[in-house]
């Protein structure tokens, strides 16, 4: 059975489709909550300082196929419980800024939101990945208020400059072009470019 067939089989094996839909509903709601907060912070910054630190905001929900592949890569069975427990980037927000200083200013503003709980921070700007990748990642939990309950839902926020975003996009495309076997000389050139644009 090919890996694609395994993914299809795993997706079909979700016993409770309603649970799957509910989880995705919660992640979409969390993206809306976080997106609204970020737009308000950006508007406030413009009002007070006549400057917008956020160039643009991108959001996404991981596809079911991507979720299954990631669970398998981590050695976990495909289940709703494992998806929620082990995959932190099902809901993702990417903030693109002009300057590195904007990244840290935004991270501080996000961290000061009383109803967002910062679960973890990975600063790949101060500590870039070996490949040269640079970005600031925050994993936050946002309360989703439903008619009969409140559900804390995780959202990964990536904050990076325009240059860092361009580099990350290029690296991603090259990785898939070479199917994960990027030639060493290209890796080295990418690393040098990352050092230049940061």
Regions inferred by a protein language model and the residue ranges of each:
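Short N-terminal helix-initiation segments at or just after the protein's N-terminus
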Residues: 26-42, 77-86, 98-103
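An acidic, glycine-/histidine-flanked metal-binding catalytic module
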Residues: 1-31, 35-44, 156-198
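Solvent-exposed alpha-helical segments within well-ordered globular domains of core cellular machineries
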Residues: 32, 36, 65, 69, ...
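Charged, low-complexity, helix/coiled-coil-prone segments
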Residues: 4-15, 37-55, 80-83, 139-148
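Short aromatic/hydrophobic contact patches that present stacked aromatics
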Residues: 92-96
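Short secondary-structure junctions
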Residues: 43-45, 75-76, 114-119
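A glycine-rich, hydrophobic loop/mini-helix early in the fold
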Residues: 50-91
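Long beta-strand-rich cores associated with HINT superfamily self-processing modules
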Residues: 84, 97-198
């Amino acid at each position: 059975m090919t890996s694609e067939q395994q993914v299809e089989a795993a997706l079909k094996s979700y016993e409770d489709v309603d649970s799957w839909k509910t989880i995705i509903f919660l992640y979409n709601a969390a993206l809306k909550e976080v997106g609204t907060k970020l737009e308000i912070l950006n508007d406030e910054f413009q009002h007070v300082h006549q400057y917008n630190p956020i160039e643009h905001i991108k959001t996404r929900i991981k596809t079911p196929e991507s979720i299954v592949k990631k669970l398998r890569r981590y050695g976990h069975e495909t289940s709703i419980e494992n998806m929620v427990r082990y995959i932190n980037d099902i809901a993702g927000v990417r903030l693109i800024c002009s300057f590195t200083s904007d990244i840290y200013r935004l991270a501080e503003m996000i961290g000061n939101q009383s109803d967002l709980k910062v679960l973890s921070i990975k600063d790949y700007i101060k500590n870039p990945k070996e490949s040269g990748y640079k970005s600031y990642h925050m994993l936050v939990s946002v309360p989703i208020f439903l008619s009969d309950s409140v559900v804390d839902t995780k959202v990964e926020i990536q904050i990076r400059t325009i240059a860092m975003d361009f580099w990350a996009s290029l690296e991603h495309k090259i990785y898939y072009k070479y199917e994960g076997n990027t030639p060493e000389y290209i890796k080295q050139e990418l690393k040098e470019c990352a050092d230049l644009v940061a």
